[in-house]
Amino acid sequence: MAAVNLPVQVIACCDANGAMQPLRFRFEDAAHALHTVQVCEVLDCRESGYVGIEAFFFLCHAVLDGREKLYELKYTVHTHRWALLREIY
């Protein structure tokens, strides 16, 4: 799927070592309806320093409207912003 790069609201948890884990996120679709997505499991977390912009990418197994989905979220450290990069399935 092509990159969406949609800004999202995220509730995340940080452990004692500072590692973040998204718990749920909310986004607005093209019809301006809000959707809340419950993250069941973070399958992968990787750090990237592309062109000097430090970011974390999270591959999340989640549930939206009773259906299981796979999403990729991005957290940009410098701006403290979250984005929904893509919905994989």
Give each language-model segment a name.
Residues 1-89:
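Cysteine-centric segments in proteins
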